Amino acid sequence: MLILSLFILIIYSSIINNIDTINLLSSSNKIGWKLQNYNIIRIGIIIILYSLYIFKDISLSYIFNNYNNNNDLNIYIFNDLYKLNIFNIYIIFLLLIVIISLLSINTTYLTKIQIKNNNNNISIGKSDNYIELNIYYISIIIFNIIGLILLLTSNNLISIFISIELQSYSLYILTGIIPKSQKSGHNSLFYYLIGGIGSIIILYGISLLYYITSNIFINNINLIYSLDIYNINNNILIGWLFIIIGLLIKIGAAPMYNWSILLYSNSNTIITSYISLIPKISILSYILLIILNLYNLNNLNNLFNNNNNNNLIYILSIIIILSLIIGSIGGLTQIKIKNILAYSGLLNIGYFLLIILSLINNNNINSILAYIIYITQYCFNHISIFILLIIAIIYNNNYNNFITNKNLIYIYELNYIKNNRYLIFCLIIIIGSFIGIPPLFGFYGKYYLLISSINSNYLFLSLLLIISSIISSIYYLYFLNITLFDNNNNKNNNNNNNNESLLIPSFNIINDIKNNTSLSLSNKLKNNQVGNYITYILSSYILIILFNFIQWKNILKGTYLISILLF
């Protein structure tokens, strides 16, 4: 019901935003047609809220009624092809919330600008950043949603590969969705080639598992692994290692990370906000599920005394060390916004993998709890910083009298928002949460991450985590310093009496643009507005990041209840 309501919501939103469809209607039917579709959208929103309310009550009762009776808390559907538990359901809910928030960013861009050139009216299409919220764009998003949901619930080797490719191909198309853009097509082809390498490695691991076990169901493979036959266990572990390495290549973990830096920096801002978060959450969550399925947690201590598991621990440790070192040091020399966010994402991949590694060596639900808390705060921080960047793009164009929305490339271009106290406050909160300053949400994520790694006796990795966090805070603070205190690049700012009205719903960002000698505006950019929901989303995430400690005990109880389902 929840998934159906989401599809209804985004499909009808795309239809309403399709200007060509509206123009086909007569003037008398346009108003009624719009109202009818807006009512359908409201129905979709009501279903989503009602589903969340039902899920809250059912999940808690399901936990208490089954965990106390030591029953199997997994739900198998479609002849054991897919498996549901409270963990992957939580991740799916989190992903759906993130996707809805990211889709709302698109509407902040200019649609079309009309410019009068002497005698003729010239239409300068859509801006470089604009992605029309049409049925094609929404179809790609829907296929991506289906792929990530199927991946998180897969209990079959074939369904794993199909789900990964369904998710990956939708992202390949998404990076090249901007028409008549050579850079967009180059990014799509580049992403496709790198993803193909990861798919080959994943397919080799799947074929190796099938060759050894003659079975495609994960439960049966794990049952064979539990027999503790040395040669078979070694080969099964190697097969899973190939799958995990292929998945890590697809999200840009070290040492194969360079492609992600180039892709994020050259892609559209909206696309970057999507491809830098959604595949990362789904793939890392599924790697955690692989570890949980591979090692029966009821006999965890016995299984990890075997030497067969050292290969997995060593390889993950190397990837974590490289990700932490490169992610923390690499951002120090960057002056581009997306490059810094890309290195920050690489650093956070190391954090996530450290939580997963601590789960291997620790029969404790603290690792699951740390993962849930950290991935939740990371999603909130990521969405908030990209919404702020989108608003800053329009704010920057207002000062520079740009005709079309240009991407913010360098950090100093954020200097134009420092006259707006609301945007600066949001930026300080987001950067503080990335650093991990208490009592912000990011502090609790890093706190439980550190506790989990120390309890697992990974003291060297815990020390490296602290050092990398300190080093990364340097470029986070540099990011903030350039924005707030660097006046060298802000000489051409115009005094605007309405600076602080940016976060007030329904207003025109660009009030006026100076006339050029040969060009004058025939339309004062009435479409260049920040909608109510954008400001509400940003405000809501900032309040969650800032005031989550008020009911922190209740949050911990909820994450604890989710965690115990896996043990």
From Swiss-Prot:
Top-level taxon: Eukaryota
InterPro entries associated with the record: ND/Mrp_TM (IPR001750)
EC number assigned by the record: 7.1.1.2
GO annotation, cellular component aspect: mitochondrial inner membrane
Lipid bilayer topology: Multi-pass membrane protein
Keyword Glycosyltransferase part of the UniProt annotation: no
Transmembrane found in the keyword field: yes
Function summary: Core subunit of the mitochondrial membrane respiratory chain NADH dehydrogenase (Complex I) that is believed to belong to the minimal assembly required for catalysis. Complex I functions in the transfer of electrons from NADH to the respiratory chain. The immediate electron acceptor for the enzyme is believed to be ubiquinone.
Sequence similarity: Belongs to the complex I subunit 2 family.
Protein name: NADH-ubiquinone oxidoreductase chain 2
Organism field: Wickerhamomyces canadensis
Taxonomic placement: Eukaryota, Fungi, Dikarya, Ascomycota, Saccharomycotina
GN (gene name): ND2
